[in-house]
Amino acid sequence: MEAVLLLAKLPEAFSVFSPIVDVMPVIPLFFLALAFVWQAAVGFK
């Protein structure tokens, strides 16, 4: 029973990280953009 109560309180505990979780799907797009910027910097060799 205590484990169930602990699991019920987990979403409240992690509510602080919700902005980070909202941004996470966009992170691979930043890496893709970084690859293009890097290739533009080296002249697309």
From Swiss-Prot:
Residues 1-8 form a propeptide. GO terms for biological process: photosynthesis. The chain crosses the membrane at residues 24-44. It is a single-pass membrane protein. Keywords: Membrane, Photosynthesis, Photosystem II, Reaction center, Thylakoid, Transmembrane, Transmembrane helix. One of its GO terms (cellular component) is plasma membrane-derived thylakoid membrane. The keyword Thylakoid applies. Pfam families: PsbK (PF02533). It is found in: Cellular thylakoid membrane. It comes from the Bacteria. Coiled coil: none annotated. The keyword Thylakoid applies. Belongs to the PsbK family. PSII is composed of 1 copy each of membrane proteins PsbA, PsbB, PsbC, PsbD, PsbE, PsbF, PsbH, PsbI, PsbJ, PsbK, PsbL, PsbM, PsbT, PsbX, PsbY, PsbZ, Psb30/Ycf12, peripheral proteins PsbO, CyanoQ (PsbQ), PsbU, PsbV and a large number of cofactors. It forms dimeric complexes. HAMAP family: PSII_PsbK. One of the components of the core complex of photosystem II (PSII). PSII is a light-driven water:plastoquinone oxidoreductase that uses light energy to abstract electrons from H(2)O, generating O(2) and a proton gradient subsequently used for ATP formation. It consists of a core antenna complex that captures photons, and an electron transfer chain that converts photonic excitation into a charge separation. This is Photosystem II reaction center protein K.
